Amino acid sequence: MTTVSCPANVITTTESDRIAGLFNIPAGIIPTGNVLSTIEVCAHRCIFDFFKQIRSDDNSLYSAQFDILLGTYCNTLNFVRFLELGLSVACICTKFPELAYVRDGVIQFEVQQPMIARDGPHPVDQPVHNYMVKRIHKRSLSAAFAIASEALSLLSNTYVDGTEIDSSLRIRAIQQMARNLRTVLDSFERGTADQLLGVLLEKAPPLSLLSPINKFQPEGHLNRVARAALLSDLKRRVCADMFFMTRHAREPRLISAYLSDMVSCTQPSVMVSRITHTNTRGRQVDGVLVTTATLKRQLLQGILQIDDTAADVPVTYGEMVLQGTNLVTALVMGKAVRGMDDVARHLLDITDPNTLNIPSIPPQSNSDSTTAGLPVNARVPADLVIVGDKLVFLEALERRVYQATRVAYPLIGNIDITFIMPMGVFQANSMDRYTRHAGDFSTVSEQDPRQFPPQGIFFYNKDGILTQLTLRDAMGTICHSSLLDVEATLVALRQQHLDRQCYFGVYVAEGTEDTLDVQMGRFMETWADMMPHHPHWVNEHLTILQFIAPSNPRLRFELNPAFDFFVAPGDVDLPGPQRPPEAMPTVNATLRIINGNIPVPLCPISFRDCRGTQLGLGRHTMTPATIKAVKDTFEDRAYPTIFYMLEAVIHGNERNFCALLRLLTQCIRGYWEQSHRVAFVNNFHMLMYITTYLGNGELPEVCINIYRDLLQHVRALRQTITDFTIQGEGHNGETSEALNNILTDDTFIAPILWDCDALIYRDEAARDRLPAIRVSGRNGYQALHFVDMAGHNFQRRDNVLIHGRPVRGDTGQGIPITPHHDREWGILSKIYYYIVIPAFSRGSCCTMGVRYDRLYPALQAVIVPEIPADEEAPTTPEDPRHPLHAHQLVPNSLNVYFHNAHLTVDGDALLTLQELMGDMAERTTAILVSSAPDAGAATATTRNMRIYDGALYHGLIMMAYQAYDETIATGTFFYPVPVNPLFACPEHLASLRGMTNARRVLAKMVPPIPPFLGANHHATIRQPVAYHVTHSKSDFNTLTYSLLGGYFKFTPISLTHQLRTGFHPGIAFTVVRQDRFATEQLLYAERASESYFVGQIQVHHHDAIGGVNFTLTQPRAHVDLGVGYTAVCATAALRCPLTDMGNTAQNLFFSRGGVPMLHDNVTESLRRITASGGRLNPTEPLPIFGGLRPATSAGIARGQASVCEFVAMPVSTDLQYFRTACNPRGRASGMLYMGDRDADIEAIMFDHTQSDVAYTDRATLNPWASQKHSYGDRLYNGTYNLTGASPIYSPCFKFFTPAEVNTNCNTLDRLLMEAKAVASQSSTDTEYQFKRPPGSTEMTQDPCGLFQEAYPPLCSSDAAMLRTAHAGETGADEVHLAQYLIRDASPLRGCLPLPR
């Protein structure tokens, strides 16, 4: 070797020879008897000498020797330790030095197909050989370390001063580099285990998938039927198999059954290798079961049978050779190596016999040539267990490989599970509301509150603490302005094909200047022609199942609980012409205003009545005597006609009432004494006047008490509105009560008006609502104080309304018109007309117009005999001087009406009728009022959705129709004019001109409200309210409170009052919550199922600032050795919940924008109210490009809070839907169910003319969420929202967004197709690698998104039922009265501890 000359640090030839000699001896001799220590010390020593000698030379001259040294060291240590792990059972380790040069390695397998010889007329089979081609997958392992410059100088003795300090520093540098090198090379050992574990996981499908696939017989392409059947079994297995070790911790037999199923569903390897693992008795190990340390400990504690505690493992690996271009022709049948001495001899070239003082496994005693080449094994500690009929190596790498490495253990993962809970649902069928024992969960009070509609849901959080969600928690969702966002919905509906439908009920016409009876007669003649078919809005008799059926044409317009959508003539301003113009149809929308207008199938009568019972609890109830008297009066078909005549001429005026006080007293007393019924209960003004002026002995005490009881009940109903309203400042000049209940809204008027009070207060109401009024076809009205005999005009056609004389004060010319009564009077009158009268009449009343031009002359035709002043007035009709004596009963005189009613009135009382001529009524006038939504519902979209309500000025309400009274039947004084469905009894229409039998039948099905008095979809009182009145079976007290509950408004601001005061708003919610859990998995792999190739290690180093960096890279590759799935995994145990499983409610004010309210103070109030008491505090609005970042609470107790989102749904929803896994939309979605057409995915999700594929008897469970552009769809569908629904913050996002649904369903479809394809017979030209199918990860990490279903947890609307259910009572009821229990049907069933 030549001498190298350098300016410094000259190396002599002798030193160079010594250095070369060091590299010729790869392993040093240290008398330890341990070959590993020998290799380690020798390698370190050579590295130190290497650095010391070549510091002044170029490092690249010696890189080859250094790389060989590190590579030899790394390979030796790597496989000596790796082969002792249980993972080595599943692989065949092969040395492949040329791996770095392989680009496309291919391996071909030959598999012989078994045969069965059969008898009979079968074709004779011949041997079949299948050839399968597999390609190797290249990988690599890399690690790095650095040597600082200071350490290099110490190692190379560049600066040596010969002191002890210098020697100490040099030893410290040597030790530090040795530690670094050992750590780096140890990382290769751990990396090999981690890499192979990852390889096995990549080809291991979930047990829940593989087990059903193996049992599914059909091969090849799966049609829709086969896919659906397979999916059904797959979903069942996912729920049953997940967390089986946690769920059945006390049932080892069941765990053993799952494990046996797990090890039996894989296919054995095609490789028959001499290199294998056995127990100490020589039985081969069939596979390896890898798990976590916790699960391993549990399995060894009585679940699995331990077969052996040691195993004989091979301490060798094969070699690879190449023939041709990158073709792997020999797999593992290479040279076998015997023990550690062979490793040292063949790998390190240690040939000196003196150095081989290494203990080795003794050779086998059989020296036969057939066994001489068998590999020698080493005995290592192992846990060999019996699973089924297989011997399995039980391994846990969590601590041996991954501890303190900052690398996650692959068998510890996370899973997201979405939970679904119904809140506020009422079981509409009375047969579903039962209790087995009267004493179950009994309460102290007489009225069991469990009969009332549920308003909350109880469940357990992660710590087993009872947690509750109430309807109030939904304020952050339902009280958001997104409830009013229907602009895009209307645009979408108008783009659909629309057929011209029946416009009756959706069209408001202008009135004319003709008299009201003429207009009504004209309407009735043309009414039938206006309806080519029955309108859909009258079909309130449908059951919930019929309503949500695909055949219901009304279903596609049921998109939002707060709106009615309907087909109407386009481009027509309302009110329009008398007949709807021939225009292209369009879709319009109106606010439902009150919750009573929600269709009866979606908010059934049984719910309304049950809510009424709750509202009336502890409040005033009418006595049985009152109920009987008033009920009999409303049903009295012989009710005196004279009472209607007197009521009309009094026309609500207090002065007129006082003038007729004597006559009215005799009438009321006479009617009571002869029938025990009460007169004038159809008129609120008369009720008030009677209780005021006739309560001091004028009437019998029992009789007057009935009037007082009625009025007291009206006041109790009024107080109920106050009780369910949070008192505070109003908005835009409207009080809180006016924003909460329609009966306290000044813009809403009573059906009968006797004076202009309501119109005056209405004009003084919120100007922003643009209140308008049309009288006799003209805009506005003119009020007169009064008219008398000299100034009356029965043929008046203008818009003049007679206000009436006040009881006190002047009414001269120029005196302004002022109200006779305060606002409270008007509220009470509306309560009486819209609640009390309908409750007693049950649809048998009708509003009537009065022919005053005939009535006043009839009143003049009264005969009062003259009595001398010195004689007493007669007291009985038998006296000839009495006005009702037979001689005085002249035909067509007023005396006859009193006589026919069996009433006894005296002459003085009759003479008081003359006092009415000073304040007369002229006509009954039709009034049409309209207004925009109140401040709580006013947006840019809804501001033009005006409400039109009709009323009669100087009309009256007629009770039971008197068909045999000629005066009534012929319409002599009165004619029917229905103003809304509550007062549209078809019997009363008989007096109208042209009323045929066909029209009478039609009137029983469709309320004949003339268009100039409003239309169903534009009115405040709509068909659902009228249907409730006529079909309710509850008592009168309950019905009054039930009707009151239906008049609460349904707007964001009104819902804040109702939900905070415990009022059920008439809708329910689907609660959706997503939680994350840490899981522990089991992995089973067959013996020798994977070939693992190890290439030559490569060392790269480069100088860096402050030292030298070394990077070690070793190529690896692997190939599967099976013709089927040779590995399987299972999510076996629940490690811990990562979220709190709590009740944190979503607040849309902090997560998304919404349509702006027209009044900013409303938005701020909603934001403040919904945030009060919540966990998120409101913040000031941020710039447009900044999100709303609410201030969170100062502390947190149970981990990450999981957010609960609320999906509005009908209160009559079928509870059975929520007892199993279901879709929060209420309709199954998924490409898996569809056919081959691309449009099928759209049809599956949104085409509600087709049945739900999961429930073929209906189109959907929740039309407000499953239909396209419905309320729930607009709220949670990420397609429409840029800042709204989010896959990160919204658990509903993946169920409502079509792109997410399509992606998940495509994944599921591919999962099943590929899993089935590889489970079937393989063809000869395929390159199946038997990887876990795409979607397996989603199946184990997010099964709810994959299957598009959420799981119901254990929850109940009543805490007592929940405690009984988890206590394990046999046969515990799922229903108790109106309360319900939902049993846990999620994978977590039985996994989390519950309180005892």
Curated annotation (Swiss-Prot):
Keywords: Capsid protein, Host nucleus, T=16 icosahedral capsid protein, Virion. The keyword Phosphoprotein does not apply. InterPro entries: Herpes_MCP (IPR000912), Herpes_MCP_upper_sf (IPR023233). SUPFAM superfamilies: Major capsid protein VP5 (SSF103417). One of its GO terms (molecular function) is structural molecule activity. One of its GO terms (cellular component) is host cell nucleus. The keyword Transport does not apply. Belongs to the herpesviridae major capsid protein family. Homomultimer. Makes the hexons and eleven out of twelve pentons. Interacts with triplex proteins 1/TRX1 and 2/TRX2; adjacent capsomers are linked together in groups of three by triplexes, heterotrimeric complexes composed of one molecule of TRX1 and two molecules of TRX2. Interacts with scaffold protein; this interaction allows efficient MCP transport to the host nucleus. Interacts with capsid vertex component 2/CVC2. Interacts with the small capsomere-interacting protein/SCP. This is Major capsid protein.
